[in-house]
Amino acid sequence: MKRLFTATLLAVLFVGTSCQPQPTAPVSAPADANQTIDDILSRRSIRAYKEQAVPRDLLDKIVECGIWAPNGMNAQQWEVRVVDSKEWLDNITAAYKSSVKGTPAERMVEQPEFKNMFRNAPAVIFVAHKPGHCTQVDCGLMAGNMMLAATSLDLGSICMMGPIGFFRTDAGKPFLESLRLSEGYELLLCVGVGYADEQPNPTPRNMDVVQYID
C-alpha cells in the first residue's frame, strides 16, 4: 500500500511538473537584420524634393542626433541653425539668382525645376564651427548623424557645401547675419531635408581600397 501511494504521488508530481510553462530560448533576429546598417546602406543623396513641409518635431529629432555625434575632446564647437521658412529660402534664392546673371550658373537657375538653391529642400540645417584642429571633422560627423536620422524617419537629405560660398558675398551677407552665429564661428556646410521626390539608384562602392595589415 505504501509503495502504491509513493508511486501515485510521483506520478502526480511528474504530470504537474510537465504542465508548467517551460523556459524557451530567446528568439534571435537574423544576423543580417540590423536597422542601423540598413539605414547606412540605403541612404542616398536626394536632389529632388516634394514641397511638403517637414514637421518640426522630426527636425528636432534629426538635429538632436547631430548634436550627439562624436567630436574632439567633446568640445562641441559647433552651432546649428534650422531654416524651414519658405519666405527665407525664396528670398535667398532670388538674391542668388540675381548674383549669377551673366555667369555659367545662370542657365542652371533659370531651369523650371529650380525652386531654391538648396536642391529645393523645404528645410535646411546650417552647421557652423569654431575653426580648430578637429572641428571640420566634428561637423562632418554631425552631418552624417543627421542624414542617417533623416533616413530612419523616411526623409531624404543631402549635404552641401556649394551654397556656403554665397554667404561670403556682399549679396549673401544679410542672410549670413540673419543666422545670428556667435562671434568666431564660421558657416561650414548645410544639410537639406525633405520628402524625397526621387529614388536614385546606388552608386557602386569600391571595396578594393580596403586592406587589412598583418
How should these model regions be labeled?
Residues M1-T6:
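Bacterial N-terminal signal peptides that target proteins for export
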Residues T17-D214:
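Acidic, surface-exposed loops and disordered segments
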Residues A7-G16:
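Bacterial N-terminal signal peptides
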